[in-house]
Amino acid sequence: DLIGGRNYADNQFNHAFDAKRQAGSSIKPMLVYGPAIESGLMGSESMVSDYAAKWRTGENAGEPIVNATNRGTNTFMSIRESLEVSSNIAATNIFQDLWEKEGDHFYAYTNYLSKMGYPEDNSWAYESAPLGVTDVTVLNQTNGFQTFANNGVYQQGYIIESIKDNEGEVLYQHEAKPVQVFSEATASIMTDMMRSVIDEQKTSSFKSVISGLDWNLGNADWVGKTGSTNNWSDSWLVVSTPSITISSWSGRDDNKGTDSAAGTRTANYMAYLINRIYQTNQEVFGVNQKFELSSDVKKAQVSKFTG
């Protein structure tokens, strides 16, 4: 389903395709974590610093990097946990390490995001890029997240499958052009980590709300990520099962802020929307399907202190 706004009679602007808004932390899987894992920089249980840090470059150089609820926990945390709590400090550290390893500030965009249809923009190379400062559309985010759900393969979103004339002759037929962006191993690690984001509920109550509406639907294998921007001007939630990816953005057209309950409203809206679709067609979400780790992924016991 495509919902471009609250009331088409009042406003015909399609927010799903045309509204360009800052992605907030919802960009982190595609820009930071996926590329870092693919490059061999880290694994899901590697440790990253969440100690207080300051911006090194840009107009905010010397100012503290701020997480949603603190200026750092002054600890090290696993990569998985840093995604669960959406640590801006940890994500920035990973992004900087990726720069140093690959020697290119545009590495993540050139090798990954550009292949998933994200718009070209100088801000992808900013130190603050992991905080989601680049404007994207809901369609961009849906396409990006479905790449992980599709074993690392990007399939461009489309609406029209085919067009036929009155005689039944096919005038147009959509042709898929899949692009392998991430390896199957990386994609499976990312879905495993994003499952923790939804299950642990440190940034969204979506899991509880959807489970309360329908137990079977709540027990689907949900993975996803949240995002918000300054003053809650933008609130994002993108979720996937092995069958479908759904993205949600909410905010004001005039870019004014909202309030700290924005994430709760987004979780509620998404849960109720998904439940309504599910009650209409229970096959859509593949509630009995599960994401599996690729056979190429190696499991090992790691130290809680060193990763």
List each model region and its residues:
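A generic secondary-structure signal for well-formed alpha-helical elements
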Residues: 39-43, 55, 90, 98, ...
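Gly/Ser-rich catalytic serine loop of serine hydrolases
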Residues: 18-27, 133-136
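Short glycine-/small-residue-rich flexible loop motifs, especially phosphate/cofactor-binding loops
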Residues: 33, 107-111, 220
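Conserved catalytic neighborhood of penicillin-recognizing serine enzymes
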Residues: 42-109, 126, 166-196
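Structural recognition of the beta-strand scaffold that forms the well-ordered cores
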Residues: 1, 46-49, 81, 91-95, ...
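A penicillin-recognizing enzyme superfamily signal
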Residues: 1-19, 137-143, 147-307
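Short, conserved helix/loop micro-motifs enriched in His/Cys and acidic residues
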Residues: 14, 119-128, 216-219
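Active-site SXXK
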Residues: 22-48, 82, 144-148, 190, ...
